Amino acid sequence: DAVSRLIYWMGNEYRGVNDFNLNFLKKMNFGLHELHPTAMLIAEDSTSYPGCTKPVDQGGLGFDYKWDLGWMNDTLDYFMKQSGERVSVAERLTFSMFYFYNERHLLPLSHDEVVHGKKTVIDKIFGNYEMKFPQCRALYMYMAVHPGKMLNFMGNEIAMIREWDETKQLDYFLLQYPLHDSFHHYIMDLNKVYLDTPALYEKDYDPEGFKWIAINDMQNNVYGIRRNGKQ
């Protein structure tokens, strides 16, 4: 992906770090923050190279956020399985918190996941047409309560079935169908709850802001999360 190909020679960590490119990234990010303090610089980086989101003056690369591609892959893999098979991959929904605070992670369900035969988010989920919707609502609820900012690509909010095509507009006609219309309203309501609940974002990058309260009932696919705000 984009940033890893700069960090390592041709994106291959076994060929070593590309110091020239690292210096370029540091100078670019530092300069952009100086010129545009409110700009968000986000790295798509699948490697574990340390300090991607650490400030340049502290030895980091200076990005504001980094895509948590591990969270994305694990979460989608979990929801692709039928209910009875999810026990075997139950740790996929908890593993991200073992490394989450190493960087300022962002949770991506991006354009990359709805093109080139990968299927759309809802179409990846196990089950028939009707079965996919409640599971997709659960996926987005999990995303909202998990620490980290959210990136949700256009079309996901209306449960697009057709993959993204940059030459066509989104399939807004889907909103005439009850399941898509209700899903659209669910996403709107979920976003409002998120914005109205400071505990869901105030301490995203502080370990005190998150706690598992139910994690030992994976046989029944039950997870419980507590989020804490500043008050």
What is the predicted function of each stretch?
Residues 1:
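Substrate-binding cleft of carbohydrate-active enzyme catalytic domains
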Residues 5-166, 195-205, 209-230:
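Conserved alpha/beta catalytic core and glycan-binding cleft of carbohydrate-active enzymes
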Residues 165-177, 187:
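Aromatic-rich peripheral "rim/lid" segments of glycoside hydrolase catalytic domains that contact
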Residues 178-203:
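Catalytic cores of secreted or luminal carbohydrate-active enzymes
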